[in-house]
Curated annotation (Swiss-Prot):
This is Der GTPase-activating protein YihI. A GTPase-activating protein (GAP) that modifies Der/EngA GTPase function. May play a role in ribosome biogenesis. GO terms for biological process: ribosome biogenesis. Pfam families: YihI (PF04220). Keywords: GTPase activation, Ribosome biogenesis. Residues 1-87 are annotated as: Disordered. Residues 37-48 have a biased composition (Basic and acidic residues). GO terms for molecular function: GTPase activator activity.
Amino acid sequence: MSRQKKSRNIVDVMPQRKSDKSQISPASYARPSKKLTRYELDAKAREDKKKKKHKGLTSGSRHSRSEQHNNQQMQEKRDPRLGSRKKVPLVVEFVNNPEKGQFIQPVQVQPAEEKVKKLDPMLELEQLENNECLNQLLDALDEGKTISAEDQKFVDECLDRIAQLMDELGIEDEEESEDDLLRTFEKIDINQFK
């Protein structure tokens, strides 16, 4: 007598996939007259557990609630005049369009004379005498080089200002004559420098 092999249900051996769940309901697992298998009992328990009313709050609920509460408080305290939604252009988009009536007002600059504070005449004289640019131009003139018209104008203005300041302070520019230089040279004792 040969035995016939019993065919097993796939449901008894393998777990149910998510794609199969929608097609097969747990009631279809049950055999009409026999006891439920272990797998069928597990599947039924899972379905029952899903249907039960969940107790407690969802995880992380205290953080989300406090954020909502804080947001409400911030909105109540916020001044409605602050934080305009109007967009502000960061770049000037036009340059004098007279056809459209758009003009950029020119910026009024104060003259340089008003900006310069009056310095003490002695300080101003020291600054002019120690001016490197002026000294370089004067050296170039002494060497016989030609300088540009702008540089010549600058030198003339500086020298005139130095003369004015020296007159104000009562300082006289003593230029020694050649005779005085010759006398001092003759009086010098050369042995003194040995």
